[in-house]
Curated annotation (Swiss-Prot):
GO terms for cellular component: membrane. Residues 1-32 form the signal peptide. The keyword Transferase applies. The keyword Membrane applies. This is Putative serine/threonine-protein kinase receptor. SMART domains: B_lectin, PAN_AP, S_TKc. The active site is at residue 653. Keywords: ATP-binding, Disulfide bond, Glycoprotein, Kinase, Membrane, Nucleotide-binding, Receptor, Self-incompatibility, Serine/threonine-protein kinase, Signal, Transferase, Transmembrane, Transmembrane helix. Glycans are attached at residues 47, 120, 196, 260, 389, 442. GO terms for molecular function: ATP binding; identical protein binding; protein serine kinase activity; protein serine/threonine kinase activity. It comes from the Eukaryota. It comes from Brassica oleracea var. viridis. Residues 35-155 form the Bulb-type lectin domain.
Amino acid sequence: MKGARNIYHHSYMSFLLVFVVMILIHPALSIYINTLSSTESLTISSNKTLVSPGSIFEVGFFRTNSRWYLGMWYKKVSDRTYVWVANRDNPLSNAIGTLKISGNNLVLLDHSNKPVWWTNLTRGNERSPVVAELLANGNFVMRDSSNNDASEYLWQSFDYPTDTLLPEMKLGYNLKTGLNRFLTSWRSSDDPSSGNFSYKLETQSLPEFYLSRENFPMHRSGPWNGIRFSGIPEDQKLSYMVYNFIENNEEVAYTFRMTNNSFYSRLTLISEGYFQRLTWYPSIRIWNRFWSSPVDPQCDTYIMCGPYAYCDVNTSPVCNCIQGFNPRNIQQWDQRVWAGGCIRRTQLSCSGDGFTRMKKMKLPETTMATVDRSIGVKECKKRCISDCNCTAFANADIRNGGSGCVIWTERLEDIRNYATDAIDGQDLYVRLAAADIAKKRNASGKIISLTVGVSVLLLLIMFCLWKRKQKRAKASAISIANTQRNQNLPMNEMVLSSKREFSGEYKFEELELPLIEMETVVKATENFSSCNKLGQGGFGIVYKGRLLDGKEIAVKRLSKTSVQGTDEFMNEVTLIARLQHINLVQVLGCCIEGDEKMLIYEYLENLSLDSYLFGKTRRSKLNWNERFDITNGVARGLLYLHQDSRFRIIHRDLKVSNILLDKNMIPKISDFGMARIFERDETEANTMKVVGTYGYMSPEYAMYGIFSEKSDVFSFGVIVLEIVSGKKNRGFYNLDYENDLLSYVWSRWKEGRALEIVDPVIVDSLSSQPSIFQPQEVLKCIQIGLLCVQELAEHRPAMSSVVWMFGSEATEIPQPKPPGYCVRRSPYELDPSSSWQCDENESWTVNQYTCSVIDAR
C-alpha cells in the first residue's frame, strides 16, 4: 500500500510539473498581468510588460535609433506594429527607465529619476489607491482600484492617440471637456516623435476631417453623409466591421468597432502623409492596406482647382468649371494653373435664378455652410432660393432618400466628381442665373430653326428685363415673409432685411453668422431696457435678452461713438464664427441694420470674472479650487487660439473682464474685436494703432506696437496674478510704494514671501475649509504668472508649456526673470518716429477712464 501511495504521489507531482511547464511555454495557456498597482513598476531591465486580456495588446519598453520609448503594440502580430507611444517627444537616452504610479499619476522616470512623461492628473483621491490597467481593446487606463466604471476613468490612452486609431477609440471632439483627439504621424518609419502630418476633425459646420502638413490643409475627407465621409469612397461597409459618426451636445467624433475579433483593423497616419486602413489577416500574416487617402495626387489635393471648379480624373484637364462659370484667368487655366478657379458668366439676380444638379460629387468645403437637419431637399431648395446669398444646397444625409439641408452662402471650393459607376458622391445643386440655365437646356435639346431661336432669345431677354424691374418688390416681399418666420424661429434662419441697410466696404456675403432681425432683438431686450443692462464700456452696452422660445441671450450693442469701430466689429463677426472650444464664448448671431451693429451671444449666468475677483458681494464665493480651475480653463482656451484651432489667433485684449463664467463656473474667453490671425510661419507683427487695455499689455506692444503670441502670454500672466491676489494690476497701490501689482508680486517672490500676496478672502476661509488651500499649488501659480510677465518676450513660455506646467505636479518650473513693469502709456500723442524707453524706476500715470464690464466675445 505504501508503495502504491508513493507511485500515486509521484505520478501526481509529475503531472503537476508538466502542467506548469506547459503553461509557461505555451502562450495560449500563459497567465499575463494587465494591471500595475502603486507598489509595482515596469523597468527596461526587467523586460516585464503588461498584456491585455485575450493577449491582443502589450505595453512595455522598446528601442529605436538608440532611444527608448514606452509604447503599445500587437502581441500576436509577428511584424512588430506600434499603436501608441507615451513619450514620443521625450525619449529615454539609455536603457534605464521606470514606469510607476506616483502621487496618483502614472509616471515614466529616466536614469536620473526625473519624469519624462506622466498622466497630468493634478488632483486625485489620496484615500483611494489607483491602478493602471491595460484593457482588452487596447485602452491603457488609470482608475480607482475599486471602480471599474468606464465613465469614471481618471485617465485613458484613448484620449491621447498618437498615429493610430484602434477599434472603439474616438477621433474628434469631446465638447464637455474641450478635448480634441487627433492623430499625428511619426517623424519617420523608425522615429516615433511627432511628425509633419496631422489628421484632425473640424466642426464649424458639417464635421469633416482635414489631413494637414504643418497645419496647412492637404486633403479634406468631405463631410459625413450618414454612411461614410464623402471624400473617402473606398471606406465601404464591411461584414466584420461597423463604423459610426457621433454628433450630439457632448461629442462630435468618428469611431468603429469589429464584429469579428479574428481580424485586427486600424487606421494609421503614416509618416509619408497618407491616412490608411490596414487589416491583419492571421492566415497570411500580413497587414493588408484596405485603402489609403489621399488616392489621387491631383483630385484629392485640397482646393486643387480653385473656387467654383471641380476635379474629375476622367477628364483632361482634370479641372473643370461648374456649368455657368468660366476660368478667371484663361491664360493661366490653359497653362494648367488652376488656383484662381472660375467666375460666373452671369451674375445672380436673386429672382428668377435656378439650379444645376451635379451628380456624384464630393461636397464643397463646409466651414462656411449652414446646416438644418430638420428639413428635406424640397424645403432646402425653397430656403436657398429665398436667400439671395445662397450659392448651393445639398442633403446633409443621403440615407433613405436623403434628409437634412446644407446651404452654402460663400464660394464653393474643393469639389470633386466621381466616376459614374462609383458608389460615392451625392447630388449638389448649384445656383445659376436664368440665362445659364437656359444655355444648358438649349445645348442638350435639338437644333431649332433660326427664327424660333431668335424668338426664344427675345422672350428670354424680355423675361429677364421684366424680372429685374420687379427685383426690389420681390426682395421686399421676401423680407416681410422672413420677418414673420423669424418671430417664430429667430435663431434658425438667415434674415435678409438687414442686408439692404448695411453699407460700407464689407460685403454682406462675408458674414458667416445667422443674421437676427432688429425687431427680434428689440423684443428680446424689451426695447433695450435699462433693467436688462449687464454692463457698459467704450464699445457700447451689453444687454440681457430672452427669445420667444425662452432662450436667454446676451446682446452686445455698439454705440455710434464706439471705440470698437466697423473694422473691429467685422473682424469679430468673421473670426468668432470659426472658433469652437469649451473655454470660448459661443456666438449665436449678429444684427446689422442701419447704424446699428450688434452681436448675440450665449448668456452666461455668472457674468465676468472681474465681478468675482473685485466685487464686494461675490468675492467671497470664489474659493481656491475654483480659481485654480478657472486659471487652467483660460490657459486651455488661449492654447486653442494659439495652436489647436485651424487659425493661429492673437487675442490682443485678454483681461479679467473678458473672461466670462457659465453656471458651472467654467471660464470662457470673449471679445475678439481686436484679435488678429497669424500665418503658421509668422512669429510677430507690429501696428501703429495700439489697442487693448493698459495694465494687460506687454511692454513691447504698449511701446512699439509689436504683438505676438507672447503678448497674450503676458496678459495671461497678469490675469493669473490677479486671480491669486484678488487685486487689480491697474490702479494698484500699497504702503510699500509699489505702484503696480507686478512690482509687488516680484518683490515678495524675491524675498521668499510670495504667499503674502494671496487674496485675504482665501486666507480667511482656511478655518472652515483648510483642505482647499494648497500652498504648493498657489506658489506654482505665482511662479507661472511671473514667468508669463517677464520683460522680454523670448523669455516668456508658450501657452503649451504653461498648460503643461499647470497640469503636472512633478515638473521642475524655471525661475522667473524680472517682469515688464512699464505697462502704461503717456496720455499725450507721440510722434510715430519718436522713441522712448521704459525705466524700471519710473512710474507712469494715465488720466484715462476705465470701466470693468461684461464684454461678450
